[in-house]
UniProtKB/Swiss-Prot annotation:
Cofactor comment: Binds 1 Fe(2+) ion per subunit.
CC per GO annotation: cytoplasm
Cell location: Cytoplasm
EC number per UniProt: 2.3.1.234
The keyword Plastid is annotated on this UniProt entry: no
Molecular function as annotated in GO: iron ion binding; N(6)-L-threonylcarbamoyladenine synthase activity
Source organism phylogeny: Bacteria, Bacillati, Bacillota, Clostridia, Eubacteriales
Entry protein name: tRNA N6-adenosine threonylcarbamoyltransferase
Reactions catalysed: L-threonylcarbamoyladenylate + adenosine(37) in tRNA = N(6)-L-threonylcarbamoyladenosine(37) in tRNA + AMP + H(+)
The entry's keywords: Acyltransferase, Cytoplasm, Iron, Metal-binding, Transferase, tRNA processing
Residues where Fe cation binds: 118, 122, 309
Role description: Required for the formation of a threonylcarbamoyl group on adenosine at position 37 (t(6)A37) in tRNAs that read codons beginning with adenine. Is involved in the transfer of the threonylcarbamoyl moiety of threonylcarbamoyl-AMP (TC-AMP) to the N6 group of A37, together with TsaE and TsaB. TsaD likely plays a direct catalytic role in this reaction.
Length: 341
């Protein structure tokens, strides 16, 4: 594919947790390549991500993943306008691998380095999938470590309206799935088991917090499920795993939808976008689709491949930083506890 000198080609690199990913994006909307090296099978035997193992895997695979992305895009570093990389939040060792690699590549190629907040990256997956998105909009970001409601007035202009106070939705899903013996990562396993279950078999609590709050809390529902399972075990009773999974999923989705609708009513945002790993949950998509259609609100969500951690979303967020000339300094460092500012 010929390269036009006027094209803005961005290489995106993602290594915040257990996926080593790189993608080449042209002009913010044309994905030329997208490579993901997943570590799920490596970590499954441990029941979760082992940070030291994750960072070693990134070291082993980053160079080849980037080379594959460039080869598939039929480009070299000289064809790139900039290199975008996740610098937080995430596992510090994993982040350092990506940041160090991106800095070396960008410096060697003489092109800008673009630091991307991993959480922003998830939200910007929607701009890749739906380039026609208009502001203002509300974003519901739900992943393994984060649950946020964010109001966007424009690129780089946003306000966090609510966030998790304890366990994020994805974290709760992982812990319950592990206890049920369903496997890792928990979200897809809970969803699959729930298909055969009764979502009203158990009435698990919904933590709405104080009136009007847009924050989330999922530690209570997680604990309620674990207590139910422990109680049954102590009594020698069996539980229907599908019913527990379905009832638990129902409680999680119910809270997410109710809080999101409250935020939409408060902000009067005409558009809602869904992002993060839990955004791949079918029930959550269906409930939000139904609710937004009733209210005349536009609703966008990316395909599952763009919901989990990936380089394409980082390239997309990096593209908009490039347009604003918001380049990262060469002393950019990993910030594992980075928040949405």
């Amino acid at each position: 594919m010929p390269v036009n000198n006027k094209d803005i080609n961005i290489l995106g690199i993602e290594t915040s947790c257990d996926e080593t990913s790189a993608a080449v994006l042209r002009n913010g909307c044309e994905l030329l390549s997208h490579i993901i090296s997943s570590q799920i099978k490596t970590h499954q035997k441990y029941g979760g991500v082992v940070p030291e193992v994750a960072s070693r895997e990134h070291i082993l695979h980053l160079q080849s993943v980037v080379e594959q992305a460039l080869q598939e895009a039929k480009m070299g570093f000289g064809d790139l306008a900039g290199i975008a990389v996740t610098y937080g939040p995430g596992l510090v060792g994993s982040l350092l691998v990506g940041v160090a690699g991106a800095k070396a590549m960008a410096y060697g190629a003489g092109i800008p380095l673009l630091g991307v907040n991993h959480l922003e990256g998830h939200i910007y997956a929607n701009f890749l999938h739906n380039p026609g998105l208009k502001f203002p909009l509300l974003a519901l970001l739900v992943s393994g470590g984060h649950s946020h409601l964010v109001y966007f007035e424009g690129h780089g202009k946003y306000q966090v309206l609510g966030q998790t106070r304890d366990d994020a939705a994805g974290e709760a899903l992982d812990k319950v799935a592990r206890t049920l013996g369903l496997g890792y990562p928990g979200g897809p396993y809970i969803q699959k088991a729930a298909l055969e279950g009764n979502p009203h078999a158990y009435e698990f609590p919904r933590a709405m917090l104080e009136p009007g709050s847009l924050d989330f809390s999922f530690s209570g529902v997680k604990s309620a499920v674990l207590n139910t399972l422990n109680s049954a075990r102590m009594k020698g009773e069996t539980v229907n795993v599908a019913d527990v999974a379905a009832s638990f999923q129902e409680a999680i989705v119910d809270v997410l939808v109710r809080k999101t609708l409250l935020a939409l009513a408060r902000t009067k945002a005409p558009t809602l976008v869904l992002a993060g790993g839990v955004a791949a949950n079918t029930l959550l998509r269906e409930r939000l689709t139904e609710a937004t259609q009733k209210r005349g609100i536009a609703f966008s969500y990316p395909p599952p491949i763009l919901c989990t951690d990936n380089g394409a979303m980082i390239a997309t967020a990096g593209y908009y930083r490039y347009l604003d000339k918001d380049y990262a300094p060469w002393n950019l460092n990993a910030i594992p506890g980075l928040n949405l500012a």
